[in-house]
Amino acid sequence: MMLQHPGQVSASEVSATAIVPCLSPPGSLVFEDFANLTPFVKEELRFAIQNKHLCHRMSSALESVTVNNRPLEMSVTKSEAAPEEDERKRRRRERNKIAAAKCRNKKKEKTECLQKESEKLESVNAELKAQIEELKNEKQHLIYMLNLHRPTCIVRAQNGRTPEDERNLFIQQIKEGTLQS
């Protein structure tokens, strides 16, 4: 009966020590132990070693074939589909480029329009502020002229108002003017 050796085997020992009769303690097998084995056991060990090496080579060869075939299949598929896909990508890029240019132009036009509107509103605002200042100056001038005219006004004297009343009215108008400004 062939049993697997339960202990660890070093690299210096024969790699087939895993399949030997378990007659010795683990790790105690050396090359001399194999010299006394019968030819049948030697042949069986040789076959096990070759089988193990063959299995290892086949699995690594299978992995390399599997790994190498996949990209090869994909590259064949890619090369067949590449012109169509490249054309699709090129058209998509071209459409994207046109859309991006259109978007930039719209944005530029909108910015220019807003800039013009802003400048126009600033101009109108400046004109209105100038007009307000002009109207304030005109008001002050008219109040001054009115106050110069009041003491000599015949119409007011006929109404029964005295110069004192006129002076109080003038002070009241000045106060209202400063409150409104």
Curated annotation (Swiss-Prot):
Induction text: By stress.
Taxonomic source organism: Mus musculus (Mouse)
Function description: This protein binds the cAMP response element (CRE) (consensus: 5'-GTGACGT[AC][AG]-3'), a sequence present in many viral and cellular promoters. Represses transcription from promoters with ATF sites. It may repress transcription by stabilizing the binding of inhibitory cofactors at the promoter.
Glycyl lysine isopeptide (Lys-Gly) (interchain with G-Cter in SUMO2), cross-linked positions: K78, K175
Database matches in InterPro entries: AP-1, bZIP, bZIP_sf
GO CC field: centrosome; CHOP-ATF3 complex; ciliary basal body; Golgi apparatus; nuclear body; nucleolus; nucleoplasm; nucleus
Gene name in the database record: Atf3
Chain positions covered by the region annotation Basic motif: 88-110
PTM annotation (Phosphothreonine): residues: T162
Location in the cell: Nucleus
GO BP terms in the entry: cellular response to amino acid starvation; endoplasmic reticulum unfolded protein response; gluconeogenesis; negative regulation of DNA-templated transcription; negative regulation of ERK1 and ERK2 cascade; negative regulation of transcription by RNA polymerase II; positive regulation of cell population proliferation; positive regulation of gene expression
Record flagged with keyword Ribonucleoprotein: no
Protein name (Swiss-Prot/TrEMBL): Cyclic AMP-dependent transcription factor ATF-3
Region (Leucine-zipper): 114-142
Keyword Nuclease attributed: no
Self-association and partners: Binds DNA as a homodimer or a heterodimer. Interacts with KAT5; promoting KAT5 autoacetylation and KAT5 deubiquitination by USP7.
Molecular function terms from GO: DNA binding; DNA-binding transcription activator activity, RNA polymerase II-specific; DNA-binding transcription repressor activity, RNA polymerase II-specific; protein heterodimerization activity; protein homodimerization activity; RNA polymerase II cis-regulatory region sequence-specific DNA binding
Alphabetical list of SUPFAM superfamilies matching this protein: Leucine zipper domain
Region (Disordered): 73-97
Residue stretches making up the bZIP domain: 86-149
Keywords noted in UniProt: DNA-binding, Isopeptide bond, Nucleus, Phosphoprotein, Repressor, Transcription, Transcription regulation, Ubl conjugation
